């Protein structure tokens, strides 16, 4: 047993090629004992720990895949929601533009109608006033003619006297109108 604990001169007896059967046997026995001890006490916990680690890694990978799929689903839903909002905004803008155009046309038509009505009313009033003025003028002309005729009949003057009488009467006209 003392030879087991003593150092073996590897190079002294001929080098590495020399095999010592006792040392080989004890090395094999030690290896097998260590293998049995490790197998009985360490191998189970190591395998269990590796299995647990593998399970936790698989769960983490599965969880990451689920979260990624959920994130992609949410992203697609968000993109669809954004596209829908943009379509609705464009539709609302188009409808507002149509309403503004319709209102503009309605107001323009209403303004034209009111302007046409005002022009028609003004023309009617002008025609009425013109008719009144013509009637009044005719009445004044008739009065003037009657007055001039009565003066001519009373005076029975020659042409020169008649002309002077008419000119005098015409000169008095603005005074008659003001009165």
UniProtKB/Swiss-Prot annotation:
Q: How does it sit in the membrane?
A: Single-pass membrane protein
Q: Which residues form a coiled coil?
A: none
Keywords of the record, alphabetical order, are: ATP synthesis, Cell inner membrane, Cell membrane, CF(0), Hydrogen ion transport, Ion transport, Membrane, Transmembrane, Transmembrane helix, Transport
Does the keyword tRNA-binding feature in the UniProt annotation? no
Can you name the source organism?
Anaeromyxobacter sp. (strain K)
Please report which protein family the annotation says this sequence is part of. Belongs to the ATPase B chain family.
* Job description of the protein: F(1)F(0) ATP synthase produces ATP from ADP in the presence of a proton or sodium gradient. F-type ATPases consist of two structural domains, F(1) containing the extramembraneous catalytic core and F(0) containing the membrane proton channel, linked together by a central stalk and a peripheral stalk. During catalysis, ATP synthesis in the catalytic domain of F(1) is coupled via a rotary mechanism of the central stalk subunits to proton translocation.
Could you tell me the gene encoding this protein?
atpF
One GO cellular component term of this record is: proton-transporting ATP synthase complex
The name of this protein is ATP synthase subunit b
